[in-house]
UniProtKB/Swiss-Prot annotation:
<dbReference type="InterPro" id="IPR011008">
    <property type="entry name" value="Dimeric_a/b-barrel"/>
</dbReference>
<dbReference type="GO" id="GO:0036373">
    <property type="term" value="F:L-fucose mutarotase activity"/>
</dbReference>
<dbReference type="InterPro" id="IPR052996">
    <property type="entry name" value="Carb_Metab_Mutarotase"/>
</dbReference>
<comment type="function">
    <text>Plays a role in the catabolism of L-fucose. Involved in the anomeric conversion of L-fucose.</text>
</comment>
<dbReference type="InterPro" id="IPR008000">
    <property type="entry name" value="Rham/fucose_mutarotase"/>
</dbReference>
<comment type="similarity">
    <text>Belongs to the RbsD / FucU family. FucU mutarotase subfamily.</text>
</comment>
<keyword id="KW-0413">Isomerase</keyword>
<feature type="active site" description="Proton donor">
    <location>
        <position position="13"/>
    </location>
</feature>
<dbReference type="Pfam" id="PF05336">
    <property type="entry name" value="rhaM"/>
</dbReference>
<protein>
    <recommendedName>
        <fullName>L-fucose mutarotase</fullName>
        <ecNumber>5.1.3.29</ecNumber>
    </recommendedName>
</protein>
Amino acid sequence: MSMQRLCYVLDLHDDAALIAQYERWHRPSEVWPEVVASLQQAGIAELEIFRSGDRLVMLMTVGEDYDPAAKAARDAGDPRIQAWEALMWRFQKALPGSAPGEKWREAGRIFALSEAVSVQQGSAA
């Protein structure tokens, strides 16, 4: 199965205590089982969140069956996922310029080392 990596960005409120709480909620033992199950059922093979200051970067590896609209629709009807989202929104804030209600914003890839190597090796031949 072909896999694809996606990258999303979001900010946290710039408050050390809130950021510490957010990180605690994301310990492997603290993320609600329903959240983990929802991610897996959606075709997400791996999901990692990185933080620099109050900026979050989420990397997702998804299979061909991943459909973000279908996942959003399922999540909208799941009270437990909605409760998790409401809890997380206490810590999160939208990026400047985000649409109303938009949380994680997709980032487009602008460089891939493997592609540069392929192009440069191809032009050297």
